[in-house]
Amino acid sequence: MSTPSSLQVLVKRVLDFQHVSEDDYCILKCCGLWWHGGPIMLSTNEDNQMMIKSASFKDGLEINLALMMAVQENNCSLIELFTEWGADINSGLVTVNTEYTRNLCRNLGAKETLNKREILDVFLKLKNFKSSNNIILSHELLSNNPLFLSEDNDYFRRIINCNLRRISINFILDEISFNEKLTRFWYSQAVLYNLTEAIQYFYQKYEHLNEWRLICALSFNNVFDLHEIYNKEKVGMDINQMIEITCAYMCSYSTIYYCFVMGADINRAMIISVTKSYTYNLFFCIDLGATAFEECLEIAKQQNNNELVKILSLKNYYSPDSSLISLKITDPEKINILLDEENYESKNELIYEESNINNSDDIF
């Protein structure tokens, strides 16, 4: 058996994210460096955000969220440790539930209460942290929290409502509780970042939100989750409605293609693309064989969109991309590789650009 390490050496090893011998586990537990079934590890993610990892939180918690959980659990040693490692002790006021722990937070520098701006700052630190553990725990700690449900917190409510309006088509915001709005928000974040563990958590816990998951997948161009739910569930939404939803978002090539392969009317997708003035989606629809030029031209004229009028007026130059249409791929990974936004070039967009160059040459 190895010689027991000092606390200082163990902390350094944990901080450096090196392997910790199982022989040292009993020391880690005694020293308060053990949480939810494993050693605590401090690390940073690809966005250089500090995070805490443990056996139950393998993909990481944003450090302030870890502090909030430690405060809820009244785990005094971890509250002190996370604060020493850089967590904002004021975040702990979100979940404090005993006077003893509140006094500890005060002694570590916490304010008496958080104002509306500070509550919003807590949320903003958490919402873009891309891990399943973080999304799930954020939902569990915030969605029923009185500080976040307060009607006085008007700016926070506007942010949530604004996020939901971008993807809401099947419900009226005023008709659901703010608690459900928060649940839908965190669910949408899981789909946005394709966090499969978090998606499964919401899927199993909130069966009534299955259509919301589908709408989010279409809205965020998440062909992986679209494929998953389309094949797992009896989707109550028509495939043509699905392609109309995804065309309402810019550069949704993968989900447009998936819906097309599953039988959606590409002309309807073309019309929505023109209505939304999404040029790239329009060219992609033409690549997939869309031919609704006359109807789309009329819409473009009504909108006084001269660029789209010019594009649609060159209909005789365009033709379907047979190599794209013939593939009929439904594998999400292959679709994403084929239609990667940075690498994919529309055949018909290139034709349009060449015609512009030729016309410019004619002028000179």
Swiss-Prot record:
Entry-linked Pfam families = ASFV_360
Q: GO biological process: any one?
A: taxis
The organism's superkingdom is given as Viruses
Function statement? Plays a role in virus cell tropism, and may be required for efficient virus replication in macrophages.
Say which family it is in.
Belongs to the asfivirus MGF 360 family.
Question: This protein is called what?
Answer: Protein MGF 360-21R
User: Which species does the entry assign this protein to?
Assistant: African swine fever virus (isolate Pig/Kenya/KEN-50/1950) (ASFV)
What does the record give as the organism's lineage? Viruses, Varidnaviria, Bamfordvirae, Nucleocytoviricota, Pokkesviricetes
